[in-house]
């Protein structure tokens, strides 16, 4: 359903050249809103429908259920980070001459945003909890990557840093809100 109906519709709004979002001047270079936002909302609804894991919410309180293998989680994030270079850089859709320079800049901005997302999430958890949280830092990397995907073809390195940093900070509070207020696991 999502792949056959929802993504083509949301993609058409921006990427068909005459979609209503494109006509409003909306820029989504590599799919931050068109791909990641649609997938994120679908995942949130899916998690709400499936319900929490056993033991997650006991007596109305949110209990931490630790990950099973943080090393494999970190490896997965680093593989995803590497793949994002092809995703964002490949959205340039051409290689050679000036296009190669533009694609290189896209890859650099993407890398800067991912690193800034990690720094943002780690800094917030360090300030809040008195120690860094590797799991949340890895979420910050992904948040930085998602945050830069829309504007990676148009942003400077400083803009990429700021987008990633803000994404990394927001993800910490978003996860807490979804977990503790909305009670979606």
Regions found by a protein language model. Give the residues of each.
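Hydrophobic alpha-helical transmembrane bundles of multi-pass membrane proteins
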Residues: 1-185
């Amino acid at each position: 359903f999502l792949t056959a109906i929802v993504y083509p519709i949301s993609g058409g709004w921006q990427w068909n050249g005459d979609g209503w979002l494109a006509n409003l001047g909306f820029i989504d270079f590599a799919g931050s809103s068109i791909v990641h936002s649609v997938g994120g909302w679908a995942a949130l609804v899916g998690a709400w429908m499936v319900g929490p894991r056993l033991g997650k919410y006991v007596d109305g309180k949110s209990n931490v259920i630790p990950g099973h293998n943080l090393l494999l989680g970190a490896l997965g994030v680093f593989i995803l980070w590497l793949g994002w270079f092809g995703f964002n850089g490949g959205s340039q859709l051409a290689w050679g001459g000036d296009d190669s320079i533009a694609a290189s800049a896209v890859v650099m901005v993407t890398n800067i945003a991912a690193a800034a997302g990690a720094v943002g999430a780690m800094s917030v958890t360090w300030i809040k909890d008195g120690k860094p949280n590797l799991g949340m830092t890895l979420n910050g990397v992904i948040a930085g990557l998602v945050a830069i995907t829309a504007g990676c073809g148009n942003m400077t390195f400083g803009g990429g840093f700021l987008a990633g940093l803000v994404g990394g900070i927001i993800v910490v509070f978003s996860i807490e809100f979804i977990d503790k207020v909305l009670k979606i696991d």
